[in-house]
UniProtKB/Swiss-Prot annotation:
Tissues/organs with expression: Detected in retina and placenta.
Subcellular localization(s) per the UniProt record: Cytoplasm
Any single GO BP term: retina homeostasis
Disease: Macular degeneration, age-related, 8: A form of age-related macular degeneration, a multifactorial eye disease and the most common cause of irreversible vision loss in the developed world. In most patients, the disease is manifest as ophthalmoscopically visible yellowish accumulations of protein and lipid that lie beneath the retinal pigment epithelium and within an elastin-containing structure known as Bruch membrane.
UniProt key word Cytoplasm: yes
Ranges where the record places region Disordered: 1-21
GO cellular component terms attached to this protein's record: mitochondrion; photoreceptor inner segment
Cytoplasm listed as a keyword: yes
Disulfide bonds: none
Record keywords, A-Z: Age-related macular degeneration, Cytoplasm
Protein name (Swiss-Prot/TrEMBL): Age-related maculopathy susceptibility protein 2
Superkingdom classification of source: Eukaryota
Amino acid sequence: MLRLYPGPMVTEAEGKGGPEMASLSSSVVPVSFISTLRESVLDPGVGGEGASDKQRSKLSLSHSMIPAAKIHTELCLPAFFSPAGTQRRFQQPQHHLTLSIIHTAAR
C-alpha cells in the first residue's frame, strides 16, 4: 500500500496525464525516491508471489532506507489521483507494494 505508487504515477503523468499531473506528483514525492521506485516497477518479479528471496531482500533493503515521513506522504497520493481514474491502472503495483511492506515489517 505504499511502495511503488510514485514511480508509475509520474511516468504515466509525463506521457498521458499532462504537465499538471506530473508537477503535482513531483512536488509531493522527491525525485530520488521516484527513481528508486522505478527500478522496482520495471522488474516484474520483485515483490510478486514468484519473487526469489534475493529479490525480496533487495526490495526490503531499499525500502528500509526510506524515512517514515516520505512513506506517509506516499500514502496520500492515491487520494489525489483516484478521481481521474488512475487508481485502476495502478492496482498491480499497489499489490506488490503491500507485499513489500509486510516483508519489511517481518524483519
